[in-house]
Curated annotation (Swiss-Prot):
Subunit and interaction comment: Part of the 50S ribosomal subunit. Contacts protein L20.
GO biological process: translation
Stated family: Belongs to the bacterial ribosomal protein bL21 family.
GO cellular component term, pick one: cytoplasm
Cross-referenced InterPro entries: bL21-like, bL21-like_sf, Ribosomal_bL21, Ribosomal_bL21_CS
Top-level taxon: Bacteria
Molecular-function GO term, any one: structural constituent of ribosome
Organism: Latilactobacillus sakei subsp. sakei (strain 23K)
Annotated PANTHER family: 50S RIBOSOMAL PROTEIN L21 (PTHR21349), LARGE RIBOSOMAL SUBUNIT PROTEIN BL21M (PTHR21349:SF0)
Record-linked Pfam families: Ribosomal_L21p
Record key words, sorted: Ribonucleoprotein, Ribosomal protein, RNA-binding, rRNA-binding
Protein name as it appears in the record: Large ribosomal subunit protein bL21
PROSITE patterns tied to this protein: RIBOSOMAL_L21
Role summary: This protein binds to 23S rRNA in the presence of protein L20.
Amino acid sequence: MYAIIKTGGKQYKVEAGQAIYVEKLTAEAGEKVTFDQVILVGGETTKVGTPNIDGVTVDGTVEKQGREKKVVTFKYKPKKHSHQKKGHRQPYTKVMIDAINA
């Protein structure tokens, strides 16, 4: 059985026992999280929500919080002796999917 959930403005296809990386959640490592915005549940039969399916949740456990690799941007203006270098590291949360409650 699989489900498509929505969190952090993105959609993820998940199955029980799968680890996913999502946008940063406020939960700490070891805490349980519940995703209630389930868009689709598939398996023997497929159920599609409009926009969400009522009464269906996906449970998971936060494994760790982290930050992705640095992305460097560089702006340069020729003949002006002007340049700007910036770096950004996006925070993420690693979640282990425990169960799909359909």
